[in-house]
Amino acid sequence: MPLPDFRLIRLLPLASLVLTACTITSPKGPGKSPDSPQWRQHQQDVRNLNQYQTRGAFAYISDQQKVYARFFWQQTGQDRYRLLLTNPLGSTELELNAQPGNVQLVDNKGQRYTADDAEEMIGKLTGMPIPLNSLRQWILGLPGDATDYKLDDQYRLSEITYSQNGKNWKVVYGGYDTKTQPAMPANMELTEGGQRIKLKMDNWIVK
């Protein structure tokens, strides 16, 4: 099936509130060594989570387009997750359901698409080259395949630098939600060239 010229809605008056809410403030204090036992324990605690979900604000900004949305991310098992994007008025713009070997996406017109790579599918359908395969780890505060990263003074990720498919991504964490155990990212910003992706997590539910 030919891929449509599908785009999420552009900037709406309500969307400016989302952008303000996503402002990043860098963690303070000296960083800790990536070889520290506290960091290894934190990574293990996060990896031990079987199920989790989070919701919040999403912004994608580039020279070509500006997209603002609410998001809901739910992980129900190994490589099984659901991503929902809604516009500031509450209407669904994109729903993605992924499991091993199968990805289904429904757009804002109700059209259903199937593929085996969620990252490639979202890039083609939305025009937003989101590094989804890596973001699945980064949103948890894990480095994924990245080896160039820094920790904050609480032995949590503060910054990641990662090269993927000729693109150099930088991820900056602006804080953590300590109401959950283990502590989970509260907001983060990804940059690559002239594009930025901002995420602000309102809350986490972990199991």
UniProtKB/Swiss-Prot annotation:
Keyword field contains Chaperone: yes
Keywords per UniProt: Cell outer membrane, Chaperone, Lipoprotein, Membrane, Palmitate, Protein transport, Signal, Transport
Assembly behavior: Monomer.
GO cellular component: cell outer membrane
Leader sequence residues: 1-21
Compartments in which it is found: Cell outer membrane
Lipid attachment, kind N-palmitoyl cysteine: 22
InterPro entries given in the database record: LolA/LolB/LppX, OM_lipoprot_LolB
Protein's UniProt name: Outer-membrane lipoprotein LolB
Main location: membrane
Function: Plays a critical role in the incorporation of lipoproteins in the outer membrane after they are released by the LolA protein.
GO BP of this protein: lipoprotein localization to outer membrane; protein transport
Lipidation (S-diacylglycerol cysteine): 22
Protein's membrane topology: Lipid-anchor
Family, similarity comment: Belongs to the LolB family.
Source organism of this protein record: Escherichia fergusonii (strain ATCC 35469 / DSM 13698 / CCUG 18766 / IAM 14443 / JCM 21226 / LMG 7866 / NBRC 102419 / NCTC 12128 / CDC 0568-73)
